[in-house]
Structures are given as structure tokens and as C-alpha cells.
Amino acid sequence: MATIIYDDETTFDALKDRTIAVMGYGSQGHAHARNLHESGLNVIVGLRQGSSSWAKAESDGLKVMTVDDASRAADVIMILLPDEKQAAVYYSQIEPNLKAGDALVFAHGFNIHYNQIVPPKDVDVFMVAPKGPGHIVRRTYTEGIGVPGLIAVYQDATGKARDLALSYAKGIGATRAGVYETTFREETETDLFGEQVDLCGGLSALIKTAFEVLVEAGYQPEMAYFETCHEVKLIVDLIYEGGLERMWHSVSNTAEYGGMTVGPRVINEYSREAMYEALERIQNGEFAKEFVLEGMVNHPVLKAMERQEKEHQLEVVGKQIRANIPWLNKKIDDD
């Protein structure tokens, strides 16, 4: 079982005399920078010159520099850039400014685990990964609570890497909900697996296929959308709040019996075998190699798949239905 560390077991001592540079001011970047700043820590934001986020970060009361200048000024550097952009920025603007005893921080282990970034031996390398989107990390912090997080130490050059990770996690509010100790390998491989077979890939494929089956069988696309896509949130919210047990308890007996008897026929041993194949490609680096090579040529396959998704009948019908739900449109705009 994982080791869990809570707020009253941590302090800011490891970071009190350090300068933290948060590279990026997107979903996670703005939450990390503002939470750390409001926790009383010394924070600067690193952005490319001319970034549209520059003025926003300054208006939030933060000091902003270029990535090059920020990495020179800081001794704890959190890289919150897209996975495919991290290595190029690191080697051109961060590594040349690293000093012995500095710390590199990541919120996902992809680039370290797959050797896209190979840090010098005289710096600490650790991970702090909140298990929630940036706006939730920020909102829960302001409410005096937090989202759970993960910490991992990859390289402990100073003997202080774990203490730094815990202080950083405390600074963004994660220790309020508990932080779980893991490794870069475990976080990376389980995160990619979840994205591919369940949360993003598996769920979207299941929704689309179920929608297509109903439409092909002659049912109205609108009815198919409601039953296979729109209502997913209702079920997921129940699972999120109380696990599968809460969901089964909350649905009708008809839904429970049908779901329990038919579900295993749909997600069956063939599906399990495909999941193991996906996991193997993650573990042996095949997926990482494929993704990195795809990025080197500007993601032609990804862009083609994105176009196909936008043109799918599910998306066309979904946009029409959502247009008739004003409160839903307002919520999306607010987020």
C-alpha cells in the first residue's frame, strides 16, 4: 500500500529560502504559481517572450520572466509545459542555467522516465502531481481544502529532494487531502494506461460505438446521444463520490441487473487482452517512441484523427442538443 502524508506532517522549511520558477501559466501553471505565492513562498513565472499569458500572470500579482531568465534566477524549477515541448525548452533554456544543488520538478514523469530529458547528476529531480485539473487545484486551495497529489523522487543529489517535494505539495494545497508516494515509472505508466484504455481512449470508443449501434438499428440520433453520451456524467459523478458501490446502489434494479450481466460481455477477455497489449507498449517504450516521432513531424496523425472526431455524427448531434441547454453552455464558458 502507498505511503500517505498529510498537512500536519509537513512544513515549508525546505523551500523557505528558495526561489521557485513555474514554467508555464496554463491550467496547472496558474494554479501552482498562485497557490505557492499565497502560501508565502518566493515564486516567479517563466514564459516565452510575447506569451499571451504574460499580462495575466502579472495581473495576478506574480513576477514574470522569460524561461531563460527565470531558470537563471530560480533554484527550484517546475516544468509545466506540454510533454512534447518540454525537452526542447529544457535543453535550450533551462539546462544551461542549472547549478549544482538546483531542483527540477515535474508534474508527470513522461520525459524523465523515457529519457527525453536527462538531467545532470548534481541536481535534485522530483515530481509533485496533483490529481485534478488546474482550476480545481486552485479553487479547492482557496476554499481551504485541496486535491490529493503524488510525489516521487527520481534523483536526490542534495539529500533534500523528498523534503522539497513535500514542501512544494504543501504549497499547492495537496497535503490537505493527502499526498501518495510513488515512483516516476509507476506514475508515468499508470497515467498513460488510464488515459488510453479507460479515461480517454476506452471511454470515448465505448460511447461512440454504442451511439453508432443505436443509430444503425434505426433509433433517432438524439435519443442515442442522450442514452450513450449525455448521461455518462450522471453515472461518473456517482462513482466519483462513492465508488462503483454508490453507483450500483443509486441506479434502478433494472439498470443494475442489466449492467452487471451485460457489461462483462461487452468488456470481455478480448478487451482485457487488448489492455495488456496497450500496457506492454507503454512499459517497453513503444508508445513513447511513437508519440515523440509523431511530434517531430507536427502531429499529422493526431490532427487527422481530431478532424474525424469533429465530423462524427455524435459530435454534430451533441452540439445541437447542448445548444438547447443554456445553463450547460454557461458552465463550459465559466470553466
Curated annotation (Swiss-Prot):
Gene Ontology BP annotations: isoleucine biosynthetic process; L-valine biosynthetic process
Domain KARI N-terminal Rossmann residue range list: 1-182
Reactions performed catalytically: (2R)-2,3-dihydroxy-3-methylbutanoate + NADP(+) = (2S)-2-acetolactate + NADPH + H(+); (2R,3R)-2,3-dihydroxy-3-methylpentanoate + NADP(+) = (S)-2-ethyl-2-hydroxy-3-oxobutanoate + NADPH + H(+)
Cofactor: Mg(2+)
Enzyme class, spelled out: oxidoreductase
SUPFAM superfamilies referenced in this protein's UniProt entry, alphabetically: 6-phosphogluconate dehydrogenase C-terminal domain-like, NAD(P)-binding Rossmann-fold domains
Pathway(s) of this molecule: Amino-acid biosynthesis; L-isoleucine biosynthesis; L-isoleucine from 2-oxobutanoate: step 2/4; Amino-acid biosynthesis; L-valine biosynthesis; L-valine from pyruvate: step 2/4
Any GO molecular function: magnesium ion binding
EC number: 1.1.1.86
Binding site for Mg(2+) 2: 191, 227, 231
Keyword Protein biosynthesis: no
InterPro entries documented for this protein: 6-PGluconate_DH-like_C_sf (IPR008927), KARI (IPR013023), KARI_C (IPR000506), KARI_N (IPR013116), KARI_prok (IPR014359), NAD(P)-bd_dom_sf (IPR036291)
Positions of the KARI C-terminal knotted domain: 183-328
Catalytic site positions: 108
Positions bound to substrate: 252
Binding-site positions, NADP(+): 25-28, 48, 51, 53, 83-86, 134
HAMAP family in UniProt: IlvC (MF_00435)
Function: Involved in the biosynthesis of branched-chain amino acids (BCAA). Catalyzes an alkyl-migration followed by a ketol-acid reduction of (S)-2-acetolactate (S2AL) to yield (R)-2,3-dihydroxy-isovalerate. In the isomerase reaction, S2AL is rearranged via a Mg-dependent methyl migration to produce 3-hydroxy-3-methyl-2-ketobutyrate (HMKB). In the reductase reaction, this 2-ketoacid undergoes a metal-dependent reduction by NADPH to yield (R)-2,3-dihydroxy-isovalerate.
NCBIfam families: ilvC, PRK05479.1, PRK13403.1
Name of the featured protein: Ketol-acid reductoisomerase (NADP(+))
Source organism of the structure: Methanosarcina mazei (strain ATCC BAA-159 / DSM 3647 / Goe1 / Go1 / JCM 11833 / OCM 88)
Primary gene name: ilvC
